[in-house]
Each structure stands twice: as C-alpha cells, then as structure tokens.
Regions:
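A ligand-binding cleft/hinge motif common to bilobed small-molecule-binding domains
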Residues: 95-108, 172-173, 199, 204-225
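Short helix-initiation/N-cap motifs at beta->coil->alpha
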Residues: 73-84, 97-99, 178-196
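Short beta-strand->loop
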Residues: 111-120, 181-184, 217-235
C-alpha cells in the first residue's frame, strides 16, 4: 500500500511538471547603435605640419562639441592631394586658398564657398630677399621686376594663391617674365620653407603669404639680420572654407547654416577660442560666396593654372 502511494505521487509530480508552462522566451538583445558619421575636414598644407595638426585639433574639438557630430581633420601631403580628396568625396569641407578653392569648385558641381576670415577679403603677398643679395625694398611692381631680374627666386607651393599665383601675376604686371630670373624659379612647398630658404641664401628672393610672415615675425622665428621685406602686393581675396553639396544629404539640409553660425561666433576675446583664432591669424570668420573669387579664376586662367 505504501509502495503504491509512492508510485502515485511520483506519477502526479511528473504530470504536473510536464504540464507546467515553459519559461518566457528572452527578448532579443537590442542591436548596437550605428556610429555617427564623421564630418571630415582638411586644409591645404601651407605651413609646418606640426603647427597645422595642433591648430586643427583645437578646431575639430570645438566643432564636434558645437555641432553634435564627430568632426575629424584629415591631413594631406600637398595642395593637389587636397583638391583630389575634395573631388572624390573623401573630405566634406576644406580650407582652401583662392586658387585651389576655384580649382576644387570647378570639379564639384554645387560646391560652395561659405566662410572666410576677416583678413581674407583684403589679403596680400609679401616679397622677401636675402640681405646678402643686395636687393633693396621698393615701392611698386615695376621696381620689383627690375630688381629681381637676374636673381634666383622661389615661390611657395606651385598651387598657392599668395605664394605663387598672385606673386607671379604682379611680377608680370611689372614686366618680369620667369625667364628673366636666374635659372628656373623654385617651389619650396610652403610659406615657412620659403622664409628659411631665402634666409639661408639658397635663393636671393621669394614670395609668401603675408599673414604667415607676420606671424613668424611676432614669434621671433625670422632672422632679420639675414632677410628683409622688399615689397607687399595690392589686396586680393584668398583663403576660404568650401563645402561639398552632398553634405546636405549626409548631415541635414541645415548643416551648412549650422557651420556658418558655429564659425562666425568664434571670438578671439574668448579664452577657450583664442587658440583657434590665433592659429588662423584673424579676429573673426565672415560669410563669403563663390563670386568673390572670380578675379582669382581669371588670373588662374591667364597664368595657365586653370584650364
């Protein structure tokens, strides 16, 4: 009797266990969120790479915070490389010089110049000479042409506005052809290198971005016992930010307007923003437009830098 009772209890427990509802299924794990797309900026490599990396790191930190998207700086090796990167869409926005900006826009339909510094609507190039060359300061392009004839000379980058295009234009306006120089004109690759080459006497004279010259003077990085300014050009439009047309699709129709607002509120008097403005050598950014660079395009075509 006891054995039968035990068997019955076992049977009941088995039936109850078999009939119990299965445990609820676990909800599938949520898929990880896709990483936010980075907004990629670049710039012509017109100065020492270390200076550029420091400056653009400060800028991307500021932009990432203000825009709410990751902003990344992509350095390039030369002027042609950044024009190509903009053309193929490897970068979204680039800090171009006047000439490279025109070259880039002509290759990307719908690209827009949106911002420049306050100093870029009245920019200049500075001609410098080694004191050992005997070239003295002068007052106009005609005197410049006469003084440079028979001397060695270096530009900056081949595609630089302030380091090649406009200096060559004003040299020609004064009556000097490149064949009037001693040997072929050099191309240093950057404004900083132009200073060092002329300072060392490798070339008798050279031309560069006036803002870079002033900045290096201020920091005591120029030996004025060896090099001096001989002439400064009339003004022209130069550096500017250009944005690709597909940014509106990738980041929103109002993203360009957000960029303009973010840049134009930068203030050199703000301690947190001073590093950025000091790097750019300006007090503020202002809006610009493609039409402001029509003269640069015309001169580029005359000199053969734009086909």
């Amino acid at each position: 009797m006891i054995k039968n009772f035990g068997l019955g209890l076992t049977t009941v427990m088995f039936v109850l266990t078999a009939c119990a509802a299965p445990p609820p299924a676990r909800a599938p794990a949520a898929a990880p969120k896709a990483a936010a797309r980075s907004f990629v900026i670049s710039a012509i490599p017109d100065q020492d790479p270390e200076k550029l990396n420091r400056g653009y790191t400060a800028l991307t930190d500021y932009l990432s915070k203000e825009l709410g998207v990751p902003v990344v700086y992509k350095p390039v090796t030369d002027y042609a490389a950044v024009v190509t990167a903009f053309k193929v869409g490897d970068v979204d926005m680039v800090w171009f010089g006047g000439l490279t900006g025109v070259q880039a826009r002509l290759q990307v339909a719908g690209a827009q110049a949106i911002l420049q510094r306050d100093i870029d609507e009245k920019f200049t190039s500075t001609f410098i000479a080694s004191k050992a060359s005997g070239i003295a300061p002068m007052k106009d392009a005609k005197e410049l042409a006469a003084a440079l004839k028979g001397h060695t000379f270096t530009f900056g980058s081949d595609s630089s506005t302030s380091g090649r295009l406009m200096p060559q234009y004003f040299m020609q306006q004064g009556g000097l052809a490149l064949t009037d120089l001693k040997g072929e004109a050099g191309f240093s690759g950057s404004h900083d290198k132009t200073i060092k080459l002329v300072e060392a006497g490798t070339y008798d004279a050279g031309a560069l971005n006036s803002q870079v010259w002033a900045a290096r003077l201020k920091k005591g990085e120029v030996n004025l016992d060896k090099v001096q300014v001989i002439w400064q050009t009339p003004t022209f439009y130069d550096y500017h930010w250009i944005i690709r047309p597909d940014v509106a699709t990738n980041f929103g129709a109002d993203f360009s307007a957000k960029l303009v607002a973010t840049f134009t509120k930068l203030n050199a008097d703000n301690a947190d923003q001073k590093q950025i403005m000091d790097f750019f050598g300006a007090k503020k950014f202002i809006e610009t437009k493609n039409e402001n660079y029509a003269a640069i395009e015309q001169i580029g075509r005359e000199i053969g830098k734009i086909k």
